[in-house]
Each structure stands twice: as C-alpha cells, then as structure tokens.
C-alpha cells in the first residue's frame, strides 16, 4: 500500500534534473529577466486593453497537461503568442484605468527574493527574519506617514500597536471588523450579533460589504450613507451621527465605521477628524481605508488628508497601488493589536514553541485570516532602500503634476468639464451637455441620460482603439471618465498623447 511499482521507472528517467538545480535556475532565470526587460521596453507598442474574446485561450492550449517535460524556450514562445495577447497591460505608460498597479525594479527583485527563499512565515520561529523585517518596515513606513506612535511597534512593547502586511484591503477590513466585532460581542453577548451595525458612505469600496458578509454582520445593518456634490462626495459627520442615533433608537448597536481617503470612484476624502469625533461618542471602531491615496501622504503637502488619524483605531494603504511595490502588499496598522490577536489567533499543539510562549515575539499568523503567509516585507524593504523617501516623493509628485497637466488640457477644450475636483493624480471628466445638444440646455433627466450615453460611447470608442485605457464611474447620477495617472513608465508625452486620442474620438462621435 502506497509503494511505487518496481517495474515502472518512467518517472525517474523522464526528468533526471532536480527542479531546483542551481545552474539550470541561473540559465532559465536570466532568460526570464531578459524576456521581461524586453516586455517593459516594448509594452508601449501593445494595445493597452486586451482585444481577445472570452474563451480565446481554450482554443489555443491543449486540453490536458503534457506528459513529458517541455523546454523553457518553448514555454516562453507560447507566453508571447498566447498569453500576452490576452493581457491588459497594467504597466503600459498608456494605462490610465482603475487605479495604478505601479511596479519597479526594486519591487520586482524583492518579489524574486521572497519567492526564491519560499519561506512560510506564520510565526517567528518559522522564519525569524521574515517576522522581524516586517515589523521594521511597517515602522519605517508608518514614520514616513507620520502616523502616531500608538500605531507603531515600540521597543518596550508599551504602545500596543503595530503593523502587518496583508494581501489586500479586503483582508485588512475583514481583520479589523472581526476584531471590532469580537470586542463588542464580549461586552454585549454573542447572541446579539444581529444588532451590530457597520457604517460607511455610498462611495466606500465594496470590500466593506464583502467583509461584513463574511464577518456575519446582518446585511440590513450595513449603512451606505448618501453623499453629495456639496461635500465633494465625502461622508458628512452630521449624516453619520443621524444614522447612528436612528440605529440606537431602534435598539441596534453601532460597531464599525470605514472612512476613506481617496475613494475609488472619484478620490473623494472623508473628513477623518470630525468623523472620528462622532464615532468615539458611541464607542465605534474607526478604520481608515487609504488604499490608493495613502501613499501620497508621505509627501508633506498631502499629509493633511489623514489629519485626525490619531483618533482612529486602524489605518491601511495598498503599497501595490501607488507605491511601486508589486501585488500584493496591503499595509495595515492597528492601535490595539491585542483585539486583533484575540479575534484571529489559533494555537494548535504542532505550532507551540518556546519563542511564542516567551511573549517576546510576534506571530503574524494571529494578525491575519490565513495561517500561511508570504515574505511580503522583502519587496517593500527593497523599495524603501533602493529609492529612499526623497525619490519616492519625487515619483508621486510627478504623477500628480501629469494629472494637473491633463486637467489643464481639458480646460482648454470647452466641450469638456471636470466633474469633481482633482485631489491626487486622477482626473474625472466628461463631455458637457452643451457639446452634445446645440440648443439651449435645460436641466432635465432626458438631457442627463443622453449626455451619459454619449460619454459611454466615447469611452468605449477610446478603449477599443487600444491606444489608451480608461475606466468610468457614476457619482451623483453623472457618468464620468476616470483618468488615473500612476503607471511607472508614464511620461508627460503619454498624457498629452492620451488627450489627443480623446479629442480625435470626440470629433468622430460629434461629427466635428
């Protein structure tokens, strides 16, 4: 039982080389580096958005895995011919969609080191360097953001706070919501979970809805509080307080507020300080989601957007968005790490060890959902060391400058308007009704619907060209085109060229 047949030596003869042979690793590794270097050199020439149809790859690849080994040369040929056509090129300098996934040499090489070591750092003992480097780089980045010391690790352990690298914002919100949930249920009884209420704005990322669902929050108790143009779609503290008071009146228990610095739709900023002041009156856990815009806050001129963070309970940003660190790398800081650990810890016999029992080390398995974890801190460490604070600020400012340039180009064409104020490096614009309807415009739903339809048509036309790629959002009933600068290879000439593409397609649609 469980033994290999003695008369079948096929598996031994087919692949005599060890899968981790150092010389072969060096040979193939150089080929991959050269392949990717050529890709980055030529990525500008590809259609930015993939032009394939659903199911294209199934028609190109075999129905089953190969029985015999294939060479890396053959595999890379297939990557070129079959995989690259199906990629949307997030590293293209003409990529302006969603939010950036900015890469860098340091981030890529850090990922190589992390993957090469292939350690599983669930606790300190399993790889001390992985744990300790993570706590160090989280303090470094926290200091760059001038986060209060209550969010950082202290040498004497007095602060109670600290940072951890999660995969995504979804995970960060789920972990903090779970900690807040258990902390509250320990006070009011676990049978009252259906009374817990979560608050956010109608602009908050859908990650909160997913986290609440997983954490067992009653879907009816997730409040997406309406925002308006009057506050640039930021969450009003008065609206928050009204919602809280209504829930208390109904016998519900306010639990958690997710405030956002740089919403996905329009980069709106919720007023952290005033919102925290309201939340603290009712014992609500406040999480600050700065997934996109948090990176910019290492620049002094943007730091004010997170003023008031000292009164929050947790704060997160995605280094894989706008901080030149490859996916995935979400940085989460908490003030009360004990609440996080109590909600998420497990201690099976096979993981017990003297280091953990000494209480002198961090076991990051207890700061996240999963047990296993990657050596994410390696790539962030390389990014911080390879570029330094000064250069990272310069990179971020260059993207903001290019967004301002694009905004200026829009301002010179009276057919267009900026829908919401530009705050960081994203511009939200649209064709104006007056450019579409020659007669005098009156405010009515028909005109707005038709304007939205023409803007939909414009964006689809631009993206189908493959020259640039942008995405859209709808705020306050207005369909707008989002132009997000942040790809590492983007230069001002690409921004200028993108505007020319928009104008050309506008001319074609309007018959100019």
From Swiss-Prot:
Keywords: Decarboxylase, Lyase, Pyridoxal phosphate. The modification N6-(pyridoxal phosphate)lysine is found at residue 321. SUPFAM superfamilies: PLP-dependent transferases. Its EC number is 4.1.1.25. Gene3D superfamilies: Aspartate Aminotransferase, domain 1 (3.90.1150.10), dopa decarboxylase, N-terminal domain (1.20.1340.10), Type I PLP-dependent aspartate aminotransferase-like (Major domain) (3.40.640.10). Changing residue 372 to G: Acquires the capacity to produce 5-hydroxytryptamine from 5-hydroxytryptophan. Tyrosine decarboxylase that converts tyrosine into tyramine, a precursor of isoquinoline alkaloids and various amides. Belongs to the group II decarboxylase family. InterPro entries: Aromatic_deC, PyrdxlP-dep_de-COase, PyrdxlP-dep_Trfase, PyrdxlP-dep_Trfase_major, PyrdxlP-dep_Trfase_small, Pyridoxal-P_BS. GO terms for biological process: amino acid metabolic process; carboxylic acid metabolic process. GO terms for cellular component: cytoplasm. PANTHER family: GROUP II PYRIDOXAL-5-PHOSPHATE DECARBOXYLASE, TYROSINE DECARBOXYLASE. Changing residue 205 to N: Acquires the capacity to produce 4-hydroxyphenylacetaldehyde from L-tyrosine. The lineage of its organism: Eukaryota, Viridiplantae, Streptophyta, Embryophyta, Tracheophyta. Its cofactor is pyridoxal 5'-phosphate. This is Tyrosine decarboxylase. Yeast engineered to express TYDC mutant Y350F together with Pseudomonas putida DDC (PpDDC), Beta vulgaris L-tyrosine hydroxylase (BvTyH) and Papaver somniferum (S)-norcoclaurine synthase (PsNCS) accumulates (S)-norcoclaurine, an important precursor for the production of benzylisoquinoline alkaloids (BIA).
